[in-house]
Amino acid sequence: MVLLSAQNFKRNDINHKLTNQINQLTANAFLHEVVSPTVETTISENGFISYILIDNQIVASGFGKEDTYNPTSKYKTMYIHTFSTKKEYRGRGLCKQLVNEFIKKFGKTHILYLTVRTETNDVNKSAIKCYTNCGFIMLPDVYRNHYDGKNNAMIRVPTSVRKASLKKKKKKKSKKIK
């Protein structure tokens, strides 16, 4: 098993055989026409992709894209999405490995967020468990009705941001006590 990642490639640098495998994996995993960006678009436009190879075949993949919509934001954010695993490889911790690759690469400097379909579905229950085990928390009041049903937001805040936030709260409490 090999875990590979790619970031900010130019379209000419991309191995089209691999991207076709990833696009097919994504389409099969989601069981419908995928609206999400293709591999080429994702990693050539400030994006990141991780995928797992077993016997020269891509069996799991996930995408990430740095959020550039709010340049005045105090913290960098990255939207991670479209985690897919071939059916016969599910339950082996591959999604967790992919999510941890994003955390390793961006978790100290970025707030990571995703949306996950929360309607009853065993695959999504497993996905939510995976994300929760990787340090994401569900934001129950932040959801939208998407083409595939109700989706909730999940977020993982870098340790440095959490520590800074706790220090501010302690300072406010100590000022109130005086």
Regions found by a protein language model. Give the residues of each.
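Acetyl-CoA-dependent GNAT
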Residues: N8-T82, K86, V99
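Short, high-confidence coil segments that cap the C-terminus of an alpha-helix
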Residues: G47, K108-I111
